């Protein structure tokens, strides 16, 4: 088949080239070793404590290396998008002093913009067109019913489930057949024509987990959905390349996607960033069996079950942002507490985070320890700083306390002295402003 002719048939209005994009989004002029990291949430309005943890690590790695930390919004799924969701994300992270160098906000540099995936449709289509010209992408008209039939055959044959090899029937269409289907208005997606083979593996060295070997990707995954919007896998590859990301911090649930992502970068001619897969934050749960015996087991913090899974919980309770980040850093690096004990006059900004010292298995979230860390942190605040932070919290969460603090500051300051000092000794009784 003439792949150039096919690409023009599918993308007649796309005249830009990948070379144009390379010129539009040049390599960043940064010091050697500088990390370009990102936080790339969906604008659902909800932020999990695990998201805050990942953002803290990503920002820390960028800042300690003289790099860039930016915000990218993955808003291609409009059904899940919440009005003001982007502002909620930015405000949440700003409250924890985790600001961005770039992103979809006023005052940001714009050379690598737009920072919302919904505004980058043409960029993705340019890249898919190039893949099609090179024989690595094709239009697929397979219906949902036909996909179900393929799955049933695979289950009966007890082979891998998916769209690949002999089961990727869309690969076999001729140019004339494709032309006829387009003329008939049949809907289609654009798929990757994977060169992967069964039995082959890829070897990956994760900076947290070490050497990992996985099967090569052989699935013809969807690159563009029927509405022309990219899937997550393809969009992330294109965006990370043209935003010049060189370090990606993500949850270990994405580890299985590494072979596909590696393949996408290679076929597009992009340099693969370094991926580090962090373990989820866990919770110890106690269950009782029918005989009355208690059993402990770890599970992930759940948005549905655990109020402490939401970042908003810590804001509502009045934990200082410094306390939460301090505690998360003790989870992130096993040597942080020892470093902190020897450097009481310094903050986490002075600490050098090491991916090699991050836990490879899920760390337990301990509310008791968070409270202890927070009591210690608050004990270092001056009374004036306590007042300012209490007022900022109370303005949003405690109307009566805010009124008292604004109408009679002198009396309010005396109450701070009562719980903060015992003679000349600093007390450590308060761990959050709601106390």
Residue ranges and their predicted role:
Residues 18, 93-100, 132-139, 151, ...:
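A generic secondary-structure signal for well-formed alpha-helical elements
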Residues 86, 121, 125, 144-147, ...:
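Alpha-helix initiation and N-capping motif
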Residues 73-79, 252-254, 279-282, 370:
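Acidic, glycine-rich active-site loops and adjacent beta-strand->loop/helix elements
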Residues 78, 115, 248-250, 311-314:
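Second-shell loop/turn segments in exported
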Residues 268-435:
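Catalytic adenosine-cofactor/nucleotide-binding cores of aminoacyl-tRNA synthetases and other
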Residues 39-43, 73-75, 238, 242, ...:
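Short, histidine-centered active-site or binding-site loop motifs used for metal coordination
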